[in-house]
Amino acid sequence: LKVQGAYLAPDYVVGETEAAEWGEKIKTTTVPWIELRGKQIAFSVPVKYMKLKLQSEGQSFVTRLEQSLELWDDWVLCYNEFYGLDDAESETFPKPDFPVRVVMDAHLVTERYSYYSNTNLELLQTEELIDMIADPEQVKAGALNTSHVVGWMSLGLFVQTYWPTPAPNSFKDMYSL
């Protein structure tokens, strides 16, 4: 397989990416999207917002971004532990070996700021939600309820209960409590 005319997107990876070098790559990249990746979560975001944040906030944005991604990892680990996915019984009930995926989009099906399925979360493509992803203080405060939505996504993925299709959602929700 031969690939031509492609190059590696300047993704930000917690614990691996050097901040100053990443900032320079973002300023010059022509790719439209990148990933902001922790160990447990990955955000697919438009590069235009990263350029905007680096221009207005400089390297302090990158420092806060690193802290935020670490906090997001902690959120996901908390949900994993709540559902018994803490690697205590890695043979019988292993923790997922894939990150929670969060993708920004210009228009969501729900007409709200977020939408989730059992495997990924979609966020409305806005600067406000970039701040929610990249500001450690907002992550600590619940991240505009997005951390809660990650929990609902985990519930659908990890609850080991079968429901017949016609079962009312209100009944399923009451049982889950």
PLM feature spans:
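Extended acidic/polar, glycine-enriched regions
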Residues: 1-30, 35
